[in-house]
């Protein structure tokens, strides 16, 4: 819409975030390879035993098609591999009666889902959920900062190209050590030097 209105947008990266896979804390699996993740969500692997877990059917949980999580899952993780159909649930709609929507993650012993690290560790922290390592690399702040963890996205400030001086000052402040320390304090991974 900005382009249609003749507005040019400027994207300024200021933080890093990891796309993570979550399982029940009691699941004995601690790490999956990138290929195993693709195989699980494409339906090629259907039992946890195949990847070193218990002899249980894998219960996959997805996100709605128009969500940021689903977009990252399809573009960075699955690449061109088709995903199995998501689990659905029926909900009441004022306009359409009962409609089917993608079901929310349920943290059963055989579940696997995905989200962003910030959501899993800050917004919706749950001691019964475990974040999996990928290729043996845990989604720690250090592994996100140094780029070792394979699924990383940058967070951007989006402004008009011709921003006001107040907006310019705010953008510049977020890139200072003080601004980057705030980024870190709230649970994201800073891109630049912090005060800490």
Language-model regions, residue ranges each:
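Exported/periplasmic ABC-transporter solute-binding proteins
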Residues: 1-196
């Amino acid at each position: 819409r900005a382009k249609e209105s003749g507005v040019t947008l400027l994207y300024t990266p200021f933080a890093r975030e990891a796309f993570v896979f979550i399982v029940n804390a009691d699941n004995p699996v601690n790490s999956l390879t990138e290929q195993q993740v693709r195989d699980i969500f494409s339906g090629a692997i259907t039992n946890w035993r195949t990847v070193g877990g218990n002899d249980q059917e894998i219960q996959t949980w997805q996100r709605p098609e128009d969500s940021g999580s689903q977009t990252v899952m399809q573009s960075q993780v699955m690449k061109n591999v088709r995903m199995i159909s998501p689990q659905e649930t029926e909900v009441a709609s004022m306009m359409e009666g009962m409609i089917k929507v993608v079901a929310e993650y349920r943290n059963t012993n055989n579940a696997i889902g995905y989200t962003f690290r910030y959501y899993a560790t800050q917004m919706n922290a749950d001691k019964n959920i475990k974040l999996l390592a990928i290729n043996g690399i845990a989604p720690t702040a250090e592994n996100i900062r140094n780029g070792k963890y394979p699924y990383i996205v940058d967070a951007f400030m989006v402004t008009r190209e011709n921003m006001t001086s107040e907006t310019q000052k705010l953008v510049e402040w977020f890139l200072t050590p003080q601004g980057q320390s705030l980024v870190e304090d709230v649970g994201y991974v800073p891109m630049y030097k912090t005060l800490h």
